Amino acid sequence: MQINGKEIFKKGTLMCRLSRMASLEYQDKYIVYPTINKYEDPSKMAELLYTECRNALLEQFEFCFLPYERDALRVLVELIDKNFNDRSLLEADDYEYLVHHNPSWIEVRELALKTLYTFGYDLEDFDYD
């Protein structure tokens, strides 16, 4: 989709990825206590969020976001870069520890929630089933 010949950024996927990273309930259900058919790989989850945020920050989409939204995304990208530069941190055997006790994961989750708020959404706006 375009406006005046410029491609617009589709924010739906970004909001979905933010909400999943921001939700402890989602992470408990799909990372800590997954089923064989419904599970989430934390490494892939972080990577998909990171990629979606980076894409949103591309210059061609600058007009799609308010300055404070871009700032929030930039801060989140920097934190993901800092905390998950070593991807082995996300490939733990104990996902309960990762989700509930790993300071790096918790910090990213909390910032993802703040970023979601920046866009005017709350976790109750999303259905994970």
Stretches with model-predicted labels:
Residues 44, 59, 119-123:
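Generic structural motif recognizing short loop/turn segments at the entrances and edges of beta-strands
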Residues 4, 11-14, 80-81, 103, ...:
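A general, composition-driven signal for non-globular sequence regions
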Residues 39, 94-97, 126:
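Short, surface-exposed, charged/polar-biased interaction segments
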Residues 26-33, 66-69, 128-129:
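Hydrophobic transmembrane alpha-helix bundles
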Residues 1-56:
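Short terminal alpha-helical segments
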